[in-house]
Amino acid sequence: MQPAIRLLIYIVGLLTAASAAAGIIDSDTYREDRTLFLQAGKALDENRPGDYRRLAGQLQDYPLYPYLQFRELRARLKQADPDEISVFIERHKDDPLGWRLRQAWLYALAKQRDWPQFLAAWHGTQPVKLQCYKLQAQINTGKTAGLVEHALELWMVGKSQEKACDPVFSYLEDNNK
């Protein structure tokens, strides 16, 4: 065999071995983080906030860290600072976590009847129940621009709507709309 071909085979072999070793090293990169992630999730499940914060603090560069943040924020939506929730939603506006937290937060705000905060958190298209809560929020805050048109769209469907729509439909009837 020619020396150039032998050298080429040797180099290809080295590169193959190096890339295989890199794959093994890469697969071990997150081993400790995976363990910490599972422990942090268990701390959340067992309502051990101190342990959660200690463990989560070590995971800020871990790709699944936002899922821990989501779980933790969702668990304490009623007590969480609205700015903290807004920051998370904004940071994750293009992924399902932001969307899911926004919906959970909107439902929590509607349940609390915190209409000003509900309107501040509102964004985009939402399920009918949340649309009706938005209309309730508009009624209760006096921000009724566009309300009648939207309420009539919800009224003019060929099926019963969510119970959350009843106060909105009563508003239409009371105001002869």
Provide a role label for each language-model segment:
Residues 1-8:
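Bacterial N-terminal signal peptides that target proteins for export
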Residues 23-177:
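Alpha-helical solenoid repeat scaffolds
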Residues 17-21:
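N-terminal signal peptide c-region/cleavage motif recognized by signal peptidases
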